Every structure is written in structure tokens, then in C-alpha cells.
Swiss-Prot record:
Belongs to the class-II pyridoxal-phosphate-dependent aminotransferase family. BioF subfamily. Its cofactor is pyridoxal 5'-phosphate. It comes from Maricaulis maris (strain MCS10). Catalyzes the decarboxylative condensation of pimeloyl-[acyl-carrier protein] and L-alanine to produce 8-amino-7-oxononanoate (AON), [acyl-carrier protein], and carbon dioxide. This is 8-amino-7-oxononanoate synthase.
Amino acid sequence: MTSASASLERFAANKLAGLDRRNLRRRTRETRPLGGALVERDGRQLVNACSNDYLGLSQHPAVIEAAAAAARQFGAGSGASRLVTGGHPLLFELEARLAAFKGTEDCLVFGSGYLANLAITPALVGSGDIIFVDTLAHACLHAGARLSGARVEVFPHNDMAALEAMLKTLRPVHRHAMILTDGVFSMDGDLAPLPDMMALAQTHDAWTLIDDAHGIGVIGGGHGSTHAFQPSVVPPLQMGTLSKALGSYGGYVCASRDVCDLLRTRARPLVFTTALPPASIGAALAALDLIEQDSALRERPMDLARRFCRTLGLAEPNSPIVPIIIGDESAALSASAELEDAGFLVTAIRPPTVPRRTARLRITFNAAHSEADIDRLATTLKSILQTAEAAE
């Protein structure tokens, strides 16, 4: 079938050619989960070392059965926005459970973590307000900030002195202010300095939104990055996902009852999106049960990350995310291909996901990995890096 728009085809072809020249074209490849940390690609079995399924719960029998039971009881889909048809009982149960788990009055579940961050900020601030966002915060935090219509100022990564200077200068001339950051940064694995940030927010009357997508389940006893500090902190807006450590799908924000009520009316990605299917909610509830009950499960990804870093002589990790910075995009792709040849799935992460000249292997640790998997990954990667260095 021939496209009706030749100019569109030329545009796409030219853009793709440019991406190819810079080793930046993205491709998707069929990959079949085999259970645990194993996947199959092109007929070969690989150890998956790049998934965000940190606790392996997407493959846990209890989580799978809970998803199936919810679908049998409530159906395959939700049919409409919650504001049109209401929500099934499991959805309200999950929101109450998440609020209690995160130490807030209320919670609101969205269709995904990305949608949650597109929803929260534009519902709370706009023209005449100002947003301060960490330069390495997730793309959806930046997107939500831009959508709001507020002034957006980007501060250097985790630089509280720079943030303080910006707050002192700019906060007094704006009506409301927000500070946006990841709790655990998805590409670097480091944590935001939340106590210092919260102190600045208190001093300058700024509302702090923490994206804890990569914290819940594995950091701070499972409660997330807010509990990684002593004492723990309670930001007014705690966002997260159901799709990583919880092994399901969806996003949420935990906040006060009034703030959540306001979002129910003003958050467009909630108002105008069909609610999550029952299976996703049932799976998330079962996953939350396991996280609350099993401390060994929660701690295993960090234990494996530490083991890996010790073998390679790397610094102590802050999270189950360990980046190996390669720099050059072509070299990162080559290292990823060599790991795949050796039986490991570790995708090369390239711009614009990460800054230019910081292409990397983003290695993540899963409770389903064995110690033997991690030891072999470390020794294989060490050999690949040494060979590449010798060839320079």
C-alpha cells in the first residue's frame, strides 16, 4: 500500500538516515519472558540484566494469579474514565493501601507513571507560578512542567546550593513554586538529597514532587527513597509506578486528601483516560502484599548490586541501578552486542535518554538473578571493557 503523503515519507526517511549516521536509531526486538530473570531472543536464552522488574514480581505465581482472578471477577477492561463509570472495588483498595504504605492521607492511581507526571504539575500550577526541576529528572517530569504554562527553571543535578540561589532570586516574584526531582535517578542510580531539598522547600514555600518510580519496593525498606534517610521525609507529592518493583502497570500519586480531591477534578490524564484494567490492580495488590511481608525479597536486588560492584571495583551502589558509562554511542552498542553474545541482555542507553557523550550500559539487578549470574556478568563485562580499552 502506497502512502498518500510523499512528503511525510521523505521527512521520515531523512530523519532516520540522520539517526543512523549518529548511531541513535531505536529499534524494538521480540523478546519472550521465560520466567525468573531469563528471556528468549532470536532463539537464544539470555539473562535479563536491564529490566526494571527489580523483585521479579511480574513472574511471581501469586501476582499472576491475582491478575487472573481480578479479570475473572471484574472483566478485562474498565470501560471508561473513573469519573464516568466509577471504579471497581480493587482500585479503591489499592489507593488506600498505597497511601498507608507511603504515609499519606490519600492516593490517586493513573494509567501509567508517565501519565501521572503529565497530570500532577499542570493541575496545580500555571501562568504566574515557577517550577524548579533537576536537569536529570525523568522526561515526564520535564514534560509535565512544560505543559503547565508556569515558568520552568532547570537546576544542575542534585546541586542544592544552585537550587537555593535560584529560590532566593526567583521565588519571591512568583505566586506558587514547585520543586521536581526523581527520588532514585533512573539512568544513574543515585538518590536525590531529599532532606536538604525538603528544608529548602520549607524555607521558600515550594511544593515538592518526588518521582519515586525506582525507589518503591527496593529502597528504604521498600517504602522508597523517602525512607532512605534518618529521619525519613514526607514530601507533599509522592509519585510512583506500579510497573517496576510491583511488576504490574500504572502510576500513582500519594498526597493529602484535599490535594488528591483537587487532582480528581483537574488532572486531565485522569479525567480523560480509561481507568486501569482490573488485572493490573489485582497484580499490584498482590505485589504489595509480598513487598510488605518479605524483607529478604526487598533486600536482594541491593545485595546483588553490591556484589557486582565489589567484583568490578566500583563504588558502593545507592540502588539496584548501576551505570557503566561508555561515552561513545557506537562503543556502547558494541559492548551491548558482546554481552548478548555472552548470554546477557543489557541494552545500550544513548542520547537523548542520557546526555551527549554519556552513552552507557544500564545494568539493573533483579531478585530472580542468581549469584552465579551476577558473577559471570561482572567477569564478562570486565573482559569486554579491558579489551576495548586496550584497542584504543
